[in-house]
């Protein structure tokens, strides 16, 4: 009998404690809804409920937690509207907290009940609130980004992007309709790179590739992330992808060629160039790649042939002009190394005349490079002075 009494008392205490926590949730919501809310008290009550085993797995608990943050935001914005002092960071922090709480609420509300049914009564209202307040996640991210607090900035930018992939936001089709998402994703990528979070770089760079202005730089960061993690195969794959996606960006091409050259894999580099040319025979970049590879392999005649083909497609390709000039200079040097150095040698004059021809062949290409890019002296200075 004593054991039964003790067991009953334990059950009674557990029920009472659970009831007390549920009461805290209701009280926290009530306080937050007052005209002059005591947010410190409301947050204290809800924070206890968020960690208590009796209430932490209830969707209602997280819904109220989100509601409190929503009310904090509303009160700060009310002060701003009335031109009273208000805390900008509190506005942004409340939006991020609200977002996180509502996301958790939705996850819990999607768990089927004992009958196997899902009754999510929170999704409709909470998704609308997130959608309305989502722009402030950008503002918060910018605020912290400009303060060089990149970990905090990443949280905001990441939340903005992640919102587009949430099941509760599926009907909004944000990945297609949100035109500034790629730009925000780029800043998420940048912040992630600054704190060394390569996994986050990989995650958000994928969305940033569509950003017209910074997509190429997101691709660079993505490529570097694979290299940093030691995934050489994926790194090479992304370099190749970068060449195709952003043909004007020399980073991908230069790194790929450097990798193949340094690892004695010129045949693979040439195969890549040939595969690209098979798909697009008149693509100036692929012709340039092939010329550059021959150039590195010291097959100067082939290099000249493909640099000229490149310039046939685009006469204003300054780098091709510069490299074509350089190949002629290299031929001159190669010829000079074998030519007689003695001025009294009967073949000396003939050899010097041949060397001069190479320099004369190089000059117009260096002049063209200077005309096209006068500020980039490294493209033409060595060939003209």
Q: Could you say what each language-model-derived stretch is?
A:
Residues 52, 108, 163, 211, ...:
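Structural marker of alpha-solenoid helical repeat scaffolds
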Residues 21-81:
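Start-of-domain marker
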Residues 68-151, 155, 159-182, 330-365:
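Short coil/linker segments at helix-helix boundaries
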Residues 64, 173-174, 180, 187-190, ...:
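Canonical tetratricopeptide repeat
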Residues 49, 105, 160, 207-208, ...:
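Canonical positions in the second alpha-helix
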Residues 61, 169-173, 184, 217-218, ...:
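TPR alpha-solenoid repeat register
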Residues 56-58, 167, 181, 214-215, ...:
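Residue-level recognition of tetratricopeptide repeat
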């Amino acid at each position: 009998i004593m054991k039964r009494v003790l067991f009953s008392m334990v059950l009674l205490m557990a029920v009472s404690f659970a009831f007390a926590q549920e009461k805290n949730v209701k009280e926290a919501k009530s306080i937050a809804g007052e005209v002059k809310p005591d947010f410190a008290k409301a947050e204290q009550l809800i924070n206890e409920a968020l960690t208590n085993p009796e209430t932490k797995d209830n969707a209602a608990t997280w819904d109220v937690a989100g509601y409190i943050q929503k009310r904090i935001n509303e009160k700060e914005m009310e002060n701003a509207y009335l031109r009273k002092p208000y805390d900008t960071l509190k506005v942004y922090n409340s939006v991020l907290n609200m977002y996180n709480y509502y996301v958790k609420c939705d996850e819990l509300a999607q768990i089927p009940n004992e009958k196997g049914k899902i009754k999510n009564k929170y999704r409709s209202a909470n998704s609308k609130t997130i959608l309305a307040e989502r722009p402030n996640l950008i503002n918060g991210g910018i605020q912290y980004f400009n303060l060089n607090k990149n970990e905090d900035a990443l949280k905001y930018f990441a939340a903005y992007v992640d919102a587009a992939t949430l099941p509760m936001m599926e009907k909004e089709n944000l990945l297609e309709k949100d035109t500034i998402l790629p730009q925000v994703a780029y800043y998420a990528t940048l912040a992630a790179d600054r704190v060394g979070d390569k996994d986050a770089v990989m995650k958000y760079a994928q969305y940033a590739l569509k950003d017209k202005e910074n997509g190429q730089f997101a691709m660079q960061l993505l490529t570097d992330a694979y290299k940093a993690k030691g995934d050489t195969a994926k790194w090479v794959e992304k370099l190749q992808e970068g060449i195709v996606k952003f043909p004007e960006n020399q980073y991908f091409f230069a790194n790929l060629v450097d990798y193949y050259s340094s690892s004695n894999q010129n045949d693979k580099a040439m195969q890549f160039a040939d595969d690209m040319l098979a798909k697009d025979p008149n693509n100036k970049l692929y012709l340039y790649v092939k010329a550059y590879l021959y150039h590195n392999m010291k097959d100067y005649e082939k290099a000249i042939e493909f640099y000229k083909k490149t310039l046939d497609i685009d006469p204003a390709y300054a780098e091709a002009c510069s490299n074509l000039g350089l190949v002629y200079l290299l031929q001159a040097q190669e010829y000079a190394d074998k030519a007689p150095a003695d001025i009294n040698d009967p073949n000396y004059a003939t050899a010097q005349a041949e060397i001069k021809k190479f320099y004369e062949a190089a000059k117009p290409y260096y002049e063209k490079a200077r005309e096209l890019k006068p500020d980039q002296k490294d493209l033409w200075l060595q060939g003209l002075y």
